[in-house]
A protein has these predicted regions:
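Flexible "arm" and connector segments at domain edges
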Residues: 1-78, 82-128
Length: 128
């Protein structure tokens, strides 16, 4: 049985993950100016260590959930990692398309989706 659904009357986007990440990134950017009552605002404008620690903390929780063999908990913690990672990317001005381009650059031509955005070679940094 599937654990996912699309509400009646709504049409699924071509890519769920793309539409979801786009919406999440837009929300993160909107919260940049939301004020201190917003957790996301505080992560974007406060001490750099705060969102970095959250990425590391949540990544550890992903590992523990996977080790425990708990798929529902793993999915939950993975979403936390993605959210906090996207906050860090936004803090450094790395947009979702630029991040997608980095992922696409790591694929062979025959693996990459048609029309996929890529980074210009001058921006490719292989961990140097």
């Amino acid at each position: 049985m599937s654990k996912t659904y699309i509400p009646e009357g709504e049409k699924a986007p071509e890519s769920q993950i793309g539409a979801t990440l786009d919406a999440l990134y837009a929300t993160i950017e909107q919260r940049r100016n939301a004020g201190d009552e917003s957790y996301t605002h505080r992560l974007l404008t406060g001490k750099l260590d705060d969102p970095l620690k959250k990425v590391m903390e949540e990544a550890g929780e992903v590992a523990l959930a996977a080790k425990d063999g708990e798929p529902d908990h793993l999915r939950y913690e993975a979403a936390d990692v993605v959210y906090h990672l996207m906050v860090v990317l936004a803090r450094f001005g790395i947009g979702i398309d630029e991040f997608a381009a980095e992922l696409n650059n790591r694929m062979r031509d025959d693996e990459r989706p048609e029309g996929a955005v890529r980074l210009y070679e001058t921006y490719v940094n292989r961990g140097k």
